[in-house]
Amino acid sequence: MTLFFTNKNYRLLFSASAVSNLGDGVSALALPWLASLITRDPMLIATVAFATRLAWFICSIPAGVITDLYDRKHLMVGADILRMILTAGLVVCALTIPQPAPAGAAFTAILIVSGLAFLLGLAEVVRDNAAQTVLPSVVAKSDLERANGQLWSIEQIMGAFIGPPLAGFLIAWAVPAPFVLDTLSFALATGMVFFIAIPSRPAVIRRSVWREVVEDMVWIRSHRVILQLALMLGVMNALGMLVVTILVLYSQEVLGLSVTQHGLLLI
């Protein structure tokens, strides 16, 4: 971790990614659990889980194009500000939506939560793309491989190993608590990214985003290994989501787990 202590800009980027991905990990448990408190309908609960990942499916390539065309620091700051606002909206939802909600109101409530979840996923796609591509501007070429490994590792640790169990403990204390933590984490990440000094990039010729997306799709199709890798990872993620989508009900109704225990199950 020598690089962390000697490179201020990398330290800020690393810390911002850690805090930001902690918020993502907290949301991964908190959103489906909130849905299960609102309704016991598996389809409605699955809608919330589906919405959180839908943005990755439909917006990954457009987000990459946008990252190439626009200032990456501004994209990261904007994405974290948007996520801060959206999670504040989830705090309001957790405080105001009846738990459980009446049958007629549950559908509307789930649609609201799903909409916020989708927008959170959309901001996450843009933010994570920008964070990965800005790294070469923050560290020397000789440190790039090590820095990329460290950045990926902290994202996985915070998002997959710390975030979900922490969310479980917070929900056990108060349902809005994980979303309050999310709001604060994204606010902190915004401040860290704001102070990163990133050299200006050469001017980019702006073209239609959709034209760039089509060109990227053609490029992927013409590179067989990349196409096969993308399809394989897509299928793996889809199968994983089939489990995660309904796992919250399985934990509650079959295993009889508390929210704290469910958080530990997700590690």
Language-model segments: which ranges?
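Alpha-helical transmembrane-bundle signature of multi-pass membrane transport and export proteins
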Residues: 1-267
